Curated annotation (Swiss-Prot):
Tissues expressed in: Expressed by the venom gland.
Entry keyword Secreted: yes
Family: Belongs to the neurotoxin 19 (CSTX) family. 08 (U8-Lctx) subfamily.
Descriptive protein name: U9-lycotoxin-Ls1a
Organism listed in the record: Lycosa singoriensis
């Protein structure tokens, strides 16, 4: 009986460690993927960059994307 309880306890510990490790290594967002203000969800070589959208001078919201660090994007007119 003690061996059965010990085995069950060991299995529970192993499963919880595996789940914790998987959560720590969650997938990051690739370049040009939509992100939030949190910088932690983009991959390490990227940063979550946000800009305000507008149409005919009327604000339409905010968009955020994972972009390369230290790169400036401009719109050609």
């Amino acid at each position: 009986m003690k061996l059965l309880l010990f085995t069950a306890l060991v299995l529970v510990v192993i499963v919880s460690l595996i789940e914790a490790e998987a959560e720590n290594e969650r997938a990051c967002l690739a370049e040009y993927k939509v992100c939030t203000d949190d910088t932690g969800n983009c991959c390490s070589n990227l940063v979550c960059d946000c800009y305000r959208r507008s149409k005919h001078g009327v604000p339409k919201g905010r968009s955020c994307f994972c972009l390369e660090k230290d790169v400036r994007y401009t719109r050609e007119i």
